[in-house]
């Protein structure tokens, strides 16, 4: 929470919770089909591949960490009524999962009637009936309590539900397709799911395959594959890294590590419908992103506040040795001087150390932007800067991301942001910066009653450190997944008082972390 007095904070409007949740929940598909895209006859599956059934159970039941569901977190399986009825009674509802059944007429009681009476009460805790199609189901799962209690929503059939999944608005939320190809043609099939569909607006990438195997029962050959929608926005980032490594100019730098660099690039990321551009080809440290951005918004300069939360991204620049190397011998250790947040909230004020109270001092650029957007959304001076030439010598590190301009689309009531970053560490810093300014734009939109629109990231010296080349080559081999969603579980009276615990990133499916050392 900000230590500023209330009159110097930015009050949140009554509309602050209007866009706390997405319109629809992201979801995945699990399906098995034959050579002709057949999935069954509407009542049963015309082949026996127990390995696929075991995969279905594990994929839809286990959490992403491969651990069993808990009282607080489990997955959901969304199905039509006929699919529900095709499940043997003894397995209804599917254990360890929330069963979401689509039916315009049936009630929970009717669906559970075939079960032994003594099991119905417990079973009722694992089933929800939705009067509508797939869109209605994922709309329900996007809201509390399900947005937090459900880790992954799986669409499991039948044919009409699968078909709906491939059409707008659902297809825009489809994150993964787990597809088992049964290498046979089943004449009994009367239901089909052609994937990938022809002439689809969405391109699909093969993310993984377990390889072609032979079933131990009937000897049928099968292959379990995972497809993801092509993430063009993350590919911008990967393609820029590839271009830098192939054509960049070799340069020496202040760290002594050396870089490959090019000058002038731009990337664009949609923030619409709570989308958060958190890169997926390696896990991005969201907790660090969020805590640092809130630290900026509060005008803080004490890196120890982050270190106390086990966030050590500023430890190197706040060390006694580094501060002394910058001539900041009078700064206490972890006092970074008038860096980012200080310039955002107190531009032009005289810096007197990390313990001083700066309420009302300098220009509060963030508050000015919020107030101006409300009064005149067409203003072309909606920008702030962290680059203060008069104070650079007092900073532990001159700002890398130094200028941001906001733009209001008055026709759509959307707020977009363009960031200019002078020095762009593509391996470590840029993924962090993308997520940070996305969150900033989302918060400023909340504070002004607007929807988040787009983040435009303009890069000056875009560089790859030589020590990061091997790690980035490995990252380039990975297939990007869909971006996650940001939801707000709690709201605050003032912008600066939001906390990490008030937000939750859902449906984030990244590749494992890749170790890269920071060049200091």
UniProtKB/Swiss-Prot annotation:
Residues the entry annotates as binding dUMP: 254, 401, 421-425, 433, 463-465
GO biological process: dTMP biosynthetic process; methylation; one-carbon metabolic process; tetrahydrofolate biosynthetic process
Binding site for NADP(+): 32, 38-44, 81-83, 102-105, 157-164
Gene Ontology molecular function: dihydrofolate reductase activity; thymidylate synthase activity
PROSITE patterns: DHFR_1, DHFR_2, THYMIDYLATE_SYNTHASE
DHFR domain ranges (all copies): 26-229
InterPro entries in alphabetical order: DHFR-like_dom_sf, DHFR-TS, DHFR_CS, DHFR_dom, Thymidate_synth/dCMP_Mease, Thymidate_synth/dCMP_Mease_dom, Thymidate_synth/dCMP_Mease_sf, Thymidylate_synthase
Keywords for the protein's UniProt record, in alphabetical order: Methyltransferase, Multifunctional enzyme, NADP, Nucleotide biosynthesis, One-carbon metabolism, Oxidoreductase, Transferase
Domain of life: Eukaryota
Ranges where the record places region Thymidylate synthase: 234-520
Transmembrane segments: none
Residues annotated as the enzyme's active site: 400
Pathway(s) this gene product operates in, as recorded in its UniProt entry: Cofactor biosynthesis; tetrahydrofolate biosynthesis; 5,6,7,8-tetrahydrofolate from 7,8-dihydrofolate: step 1/1
Listed EC numbers: 1.5.1.3, 2.1.1.45
UniProt keyword Manganese present: no
Disulfide bond entries: none
Catalytic reaction list: (6S)-5,6,7,8-tetrahydrofolate + NADP(+) = 7,8-dihydrofolate + NADPH + H(+); dUMP + (6R)-5,10-methylene-5,6,7,8-tetrahydrofolate = 7,8-dihydrofolate + dTMP
GO annotation, cellular component aspect: cytosol; mitochondrion
CDD domains reported for this sequence: DHFR, TS_Pyrimidine_HMase
Positions contributing to substrate binding: 30, 52, 162, 180
PANTHER family named among the record's database cross-references: THYMIDYLATE SYNTHASE (PTHR11548:SF2), THYMIDYLATE SYNTHASE 1 (PTHR11548)
Free-text function comment from the UniProt entry: Bifunctional enzyme. Involved in de novo dTMP biosynthesis. Key enzyme in folate metabolism. Catalyzes an essential reaction for de novo glycine and purine synthesis, DNA precursor synthesis, and for the conversion of dUMP to dTMP.
Family stated for the protein in its record: In the N-terminal section; belongs to the dihydrofolate reductase family.
NCBIfam families named in the record: PRK01827.1-3 (NF002497), thym_sym (TIGR03284)
Protein name in UniProt: Bifunctional dihydrofolate reductase-thymidylate synthase
Lineage: Eukaryota, Discoba, Euglenozoa, Kinetoplastea, Metakinetoplastina
């Amino acid at each position: 929470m900000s230590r500023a007095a209330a009159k110097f904070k930015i009050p949140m409007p009554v509309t602050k919770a209007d866009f706390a949740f997405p319109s629809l929940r992201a979801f995945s598909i699990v399906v098995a089909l034959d050579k002709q895209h057949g999935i069954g006859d509407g009542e049963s599956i015309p082949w026996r591949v127990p390995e696929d059934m075991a995969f279905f159970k594990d994929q839809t039941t286990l959490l992403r960490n491969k651990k069993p569901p808990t009282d607080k977190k489990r997955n959901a399986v969304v199905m039509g009524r006929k699919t529900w009825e095709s499940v043997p009674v003894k397995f209804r509802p599917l254990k360890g999962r929330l069963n979401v059944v689509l039916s315009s007429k049936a009630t929970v009681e009717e669906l559970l009637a075939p079960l032994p009476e003594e099991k119905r009460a417990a079973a009722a805790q694992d089933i929800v009936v939705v009067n509508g199609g797939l869109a209605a189901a994922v709309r329900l799962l996007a809201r509390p309590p399900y947005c937090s209690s459900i880790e992954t929503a799986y669409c499991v059939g039948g044919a009409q539900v699968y078909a709906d999944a491939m059409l707008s608005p659902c297809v825009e939320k489809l994150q993964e397709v787990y597809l088992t190809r049964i290498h046979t043609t089943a004449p009994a099939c009367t239901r089909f799911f052609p994937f990938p569909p022809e002439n689809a607006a969405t391109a699909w990438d093969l993310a993984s395959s377990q390889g072609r195997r032979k079933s131990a029962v009937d000897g049928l050959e099968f292959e379990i594959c995972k497809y993801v929608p092509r993430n063009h926005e993350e590919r911008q980032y990967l393609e820029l890294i590839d271009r830098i490594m192939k054509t960049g100019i070799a340069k020496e730098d202040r760290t002594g590590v050396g870089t490959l660099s090019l000058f002038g690039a731009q990337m664009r990321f949609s923030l619409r419908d709570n989308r958060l551009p958190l890169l997926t080809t390696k896990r991005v440290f969201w907790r660090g992103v969020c805590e640092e951005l809130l630290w900026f918004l509060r005008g803080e300069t004490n890196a120890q506040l982050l270190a106390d939360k086990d966030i050590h991204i500023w430890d190197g620049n706040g060390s006694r040795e580094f501060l002394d190397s910058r001539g900041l011998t009078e700064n206490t250790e972890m006092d970074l001087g008038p860096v980012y947040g200080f310039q955002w909230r107190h531009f032009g004020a005289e810096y007197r150390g990390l313990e001083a109270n700066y309420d009302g001092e300098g220009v509060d650029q963030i508050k000015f932007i919020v107030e101006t957007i409300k009064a005149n959304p067409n203003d072309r001076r909606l920008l702030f800067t962290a680059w203060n030439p008069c104070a650079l010598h007092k900073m532990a590190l001159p700002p890398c991301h130094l200028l941001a301009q906001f733009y209001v689309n008055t026709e759509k009531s959307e707020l977009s942001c363009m960031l200019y970053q002078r020095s762009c560490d593509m391996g470590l810093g840029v993924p962090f910066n993308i997520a940070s300014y996305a969150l900033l734009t989302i918060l400023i939109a909340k504070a002004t009653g607007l929807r988040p629109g787009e983040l435009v990231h303009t890069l000056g010296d875009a560089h790859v450190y030589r020590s990061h080349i091997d790690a980035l080559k490995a990252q380039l081999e990975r297939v990007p997944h869909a971006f996650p969603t940001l939801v707000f579980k709690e709201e605050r009276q003032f912008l600066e008082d939001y906390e990490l615990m008030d937000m939750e990133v859902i449906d984030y499916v990244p590749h494992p972390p890749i170790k890269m050392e920071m060049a200091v």
